[in-house]
């Protein structure tokens, strides 16, 4: 299982780091068409999974990140959860936690997003990040056991 865990972790780390590469390449693209093209490609890929609204995104290198603040929080939570996962749970333990932990972890993000959507208030990027982080961190403990169990059954 350790081998598969490392493959998943490294793959996700590449995905995560590319969130930072898009604005960095956009910055380099201010003086180079090559880097501008690469950044446009990265933004296009991430546009498939995120709205990328500038007012809901963090900026680095003077350019918005490849995903919005909430998505960035989710992916940061997933990465942190994946890194600490083997310290909390054995990789060959396929039992998932009680569903209520996941529901409770999703409530802050749902409340934040819904209250903004219906116009009760305007959220802010730090809150979007935090609520996304909570959800992303928690979901790891549900998805990885299912994934590892599938791998175990396939290759046992």
From Swiss-Prot:
Pfam families reported for this sequence: DUF2085
Keyword hit for Phosphoprotein: no
InterPro entries: DUF2085_TM
Sorted UniProt keywords: Cell membrane, Membrane, Transmembrane, Transmembrane helix
Compartments it resides in: Cell membrane
Topological type in the membrane: Multi-pass membrane protein
GO CC, alphabetical: plasma membrane
Predominant subcellular localization, coarse grouping: membrane
The keyword Lipid biosynthesis is assigned to this record: no
Transmembrane segments: 6-26, 34-54, 68-88, 100-120, 129-149
Protein name: Uncharacterized protein MJ1492
Lineage per the UniProt record: Archaea, Methanobacteriati, Methanobacteriota, Methanomada group, Methanococci
């Amino acid at each position: 299982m350790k081998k598969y865990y490392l493959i998943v972790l490294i793959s996700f780390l590449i995905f995560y780091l590319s969130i930072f590469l898009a604005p960095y390449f956009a910055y380099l693209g201010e003086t180079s068409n090559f880097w501008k093209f690469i950044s446009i490609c990265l933004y296009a890929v991430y546009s498939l999974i995120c709205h990328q609204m500038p007012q809901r995104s963090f900026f680095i290198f003077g350019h918005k990140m490849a995903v919005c603040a909430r998505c960035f929080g989710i992916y940061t939570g997933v990465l942190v959860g994946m890194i600490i996962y083997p310290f909390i749970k054995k990789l060959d333990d396929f039992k998932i936690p009680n569903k209520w932990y996941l529901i409770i972890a999703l409530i802050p993000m749902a409340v934040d997003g819904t209250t903004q959507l219906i116009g009760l208030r305007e959220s802010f990027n730090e809150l979007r990040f935090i609520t996304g982080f909570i959800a992303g961190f928690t979901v790891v403990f549900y998805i990885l056991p299912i994934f590892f169990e599938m791998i175990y059954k396939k290759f046992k």
